[in-house]
Amino acid sequence: THGQAMFFRLEWFAMKYSNDDELLALCRNELFSAVIGDVMDLMGYTHQFLPPQVQPLRDDMIVAGRAMPVLEADDDGGEGPGRVNEMLNQPFGLMLRALDDLQKNEVYVCTGSSPSYALWGELMSTCAINRGAVGAVVDGYSRDTKGILEQNFPCFSYGRYAQDQRPRGKVVDLRCTIKIGAVKIQPGDIIFGDLDGVCVIPKQIEKEVIEAAWEKAHGEKRV
């Protein structure tokens, strides 16, 4: 029967991954943003796509990883011992700490600044790759485009703009809850992005979403 077939397909799906590496690889290789978004819509999660201007730097880039949220702020030029965190007196604030804190399979996700300078670049990509991170998604621009493309590092941004964040902005917090557009992003949520955009899968529903998206994707291929 159809019910039995569905059961066996989902049982087979559950055997396709036994750890986070395999789960995220399955997302990258077998899913796409539209089907993930459709599934979350049906579950009542109707605001999970980042604004449409956040696009891959190259059309074939796909990102699937765990969110490491980073909060940026425009730099007012203020310095001194009155600051709660002396790291904020550094030229990039907590940016170097954020890069150093990246873990395997994580995605650097940044918001909070005005769209007047680049939030990601080649050297940041190099640091991220060395730490096992799998992508960057920024609510703003990226730069050093040639270098990022040569590294084949998935980068999603508003597009290319060379103006540097120093002395215009600083990272002020990391591993915190952030919001991009209407989407709340918490540490550990799954970030999935492809040519059609970037969506956020809340950690608490990731298993149900990915299983349903896999079933829907494979069902559509059979039609």
Where are these regions (language model features)?
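Short, Lys/Arg-enriched N-terminal segments with co-localized hydrophobic residues
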Residues: 1-14
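Intrinsically disordered, low-complexity regions enriched in acidic/Ser/Thr/Pro/Gln residues
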Residues: 12-98, 219-221
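Structural motif
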Residues: 37, 47-48, 66-69, 106-109, ...
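Buried hydrophobic positions in well-ordered alpha/beta secondary-structure cores of metabolic enzymes
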Residues: 40, 128, 189-191
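Extracellular/luminal Protease-associated
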Residues: 97-139
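A contiguous pocket-lining binding segment that forms or flanks enzyme active sites
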Residues: 137-139, 145-193
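A hydrophobic, small-residue-rich beta->alpha segment in the mid-to-C-terminal subdomain
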Residues: 190-223
